[in-house]
């Protein structure tokens, strides 16, 4: 075997369609585009979603909802993340100081995910029922 004798396997390569090259090719004259009409023209085709002038589906259906602006300032924190806070009383500012929430956050809710190993006192922070039980079980309190 030599590099100059290498060839692709038989039938693995096919010649490209040569359009408009005479009647004998089977793709002469109209080049497989039929006679006249929009699709026979160069650059002629409708845009995606066009329904022939009928009001398209994406415009017939109603719009709904919007992104809430206040959602940007609300955060949730997991129970096990409170273990990283080295303070007895956990407030919004404490969480910001320890980098658990962004500086622009205005309300926080603690959710019951993971375990809490130490007693902490939450002040001005909302929490789920499961998180409250876990905090009180660890010897902490929710104010």
Curated annotation (Swiss-Prot):
The keyword Transmembrane does not apply. GO terms for cellular component: cytosolic large ribosomal subunit. The keyword rRNA-binding applies. GO terms for molecular function: rRNA binding; structural constituent of ribosome. Residues 1-52 are annotated as: Disordered. Keywords: Ribonucleoprotein, Ribosomal protein, RNA-binding, rRNA-binding. Pfam families: Ribosomal_L27A. Residues 21-31 have a biased composition (Gly residues). One of its GO terms (biological process) is translation. Transmembrane segments: none annotated. Binds to the 23S rRNA. Part of the 50S ribosomal subunit. PANTHER family: 50S RIBOSOMAL PROTEIN L15, LARGE RIBOSOMAL SUBUNIT PROTEIN UL15M. Belongs to the universal ribosomal protein uL15 family. NCBIfam families: rplO_bact (TIGR01071). This is Large ribosomal subunit protein uL15. It comes from Francisella tularensis subsp. holarctica (strain LVS).
């Amino acid at each position: 075997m030599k590099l100059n004798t290498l060839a692709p396997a038989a039938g693995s390569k096919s010649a490209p369609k040569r359009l408009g090259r005479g009647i004998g090719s089977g793709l002469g004259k109209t080049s497989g585009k039929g006679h006249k009409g929009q699709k026979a023209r160069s650059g002629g085709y409708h845009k995606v979603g066009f329904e022939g002038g009928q009001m398209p589906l994406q415009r017939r259906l109603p719009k709904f909802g919007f992104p809430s602006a206040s959602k940007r300032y609300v955060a949730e924190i997991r129970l096990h993340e409170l273990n990283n806070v080295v303070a007895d009383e956990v407030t919004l500012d404490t969480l910001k100081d320890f980098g658990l929430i962004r500086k622009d956050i205005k309300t926080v809710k603690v959710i019951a995910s993971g375990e809490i190993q130490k007693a902490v006192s939450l002040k001005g922070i909302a929490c789920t029922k499961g998180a409250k039980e876990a905090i009180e079980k660890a010897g902490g309190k929710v104010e």
